[in-house]
Regions:
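Short alpha-helical packing/oligomerization segments
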Residues: 126, 133, 224-248
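Membrane-interface helix-boundary motifs at transmembrane edges
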Residues: 162, 212-216, 260-267
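C-terminal transmembrane module of polytopic alpha-helical membrane proteins
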Residues: 1-78, 234-290
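Hydrophobic alpha-helical transmembrane segments
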Residues: 30-38, 116-125, 144-145, 168, ...
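Alpha-helical transmembrane segments that form the membrane-embedded catalytic/substrate-binding core
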Residues: 147-154, 194-206, 239-257
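Central hydrophobic cores of alpha-helical transmembrane segments
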Residues: 174-177, 220-229, 271-277
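N-terminal TM1-TM2 helical hairpin plus the immediately adjacent luminal interfacial "cap"
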Residues: 82-196, 236-238
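Alpha-helical membrane-inserting segments
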Residues: 95-99, 180, 184, 188, ...
Length: 290
């Protein structure tokens, strides 16, 4: 059976006690906006009374919509809770991996020669000739499995940390712990390294400190960290030294950020994080010149 639709009955008409869309249905309820009689099927609950389908459509059509540009500005503005930094880091890693793929990397085995990987990877004691690699090393990955695991970990750890710390502190934590991972490789391993796992271990270390401060049980975090450290140590081809270096720096920065969280200590916090970065860079430079 198909419901028929007829024009609204004028005010005062005897049909006023029948739904304007379904004349065979008696009703004593009217739309709060236009006064049309509407049956239960045609009623949409409003803040005051009920509305008919036409008034609902008109209201939706006239509702102001924010342009895409405005939505983007709101998303990236300081103070936004959207994890833009985390998603940006993941996006850069994916783009770099695709560039590696099209320039010679075998994404399944990690074999092949890619100039992108070669130019962005970190080589021990090479900070003087390729200083950018202490940053770009975080965006290079060797295989599908490598980038999949790291990006999942970055998403799981990065989103809550970015919302807790804010975008600027989160990025500072990521990149400084990444330098800490490079220091671990520079002093205790003599092989090129790629991947964001060292920085992710740094995020995990800081997350443990913040979770303990908030009274959250950290047993599961300890288990995750221990298992991944063990995997890195016993499975060949994984730079566990980077994991340890990033983790140590992450724990230290976690304490620093907590101790200087008050607004009045903002300058102390900035100076402290910058100081840690300078010490790490000095260690790399000294090791390269030794």
């Amino acid at each position: 059976m198909t419901d028929s639709i007829s024009p609204a009955a004028p005010a005062g008409n005897p049909a006023d006690n029948h739904c304007y869309r379904h004349p065979d249905r008696e009703t004593y309820v009217k739309c709060q906006r236009c006064g049309r009689p509407i049956c239960g099927q045609c009623q949409t609950l409003a803040p005051v009374g009920v509305h008919c389908p036409e008034c609902v459509r008109e209201a939706r059509g006239s509702a102001p919509s924010r342009p895409i540009g405005r939505r983007f500005v709101n998303a990236v503005r300081p103070g936004s809770t959207r994890p833009i930094a985390t998603f940006t880091l993941i996006g850069i890693c994916v783009v770099v991996f695709l560039l590696e793929w099209v320039t010679g990397l075998n994404p399944l085995t990690g074999g092949g020669q890619s100039p992108v990987e070669y130019d962005l990877a970190y080589f021990p004691h090479d900070i003087i000739h390729a200083p950018w690699t202490i940053i770009t090393v975080n965006f290079v990955h060797e295989s599908f499995l490598h980038i999949l695991f790291n990006m999942y970990s970055l998403f799981v750890v990065g989103v809550p940390l970015e919302r807790y710390l804010g975008r600027t502190r989160f990025l500072a934590l990521f990149f400084v712990t990444g330098i800490g991972a490079v220091v671990g490789v520079d002093f205790f391993a003599n092989e090129p390294v790629v991947g964001a796992s060292g920085a992710i271990f740094g995020l995990l270390g800081a997350l443990v400190i913040f979770a303990r401060r908030m009274g959250i049980r950290t047993t599961q975090l300890y288990i995750v960290i221990a298992l991944n450290l063990a995997i890195g140590y016993f499975v060949p081809g994984i730079a566990w030294q980077a994991h340890v270096g990033g983790l140590i720096v992450g724990v230290g920065l976690g304490f620093l950020l907590l101790r200087t969280a008050a607004i009045r200590r903002r300058v102390t916090q900035i100076a402290g994080v910058a100081g840690v970065a300078v010490v790490l860079l000095a260690a790399l430079l000294a090791n390269a010149l030794a």
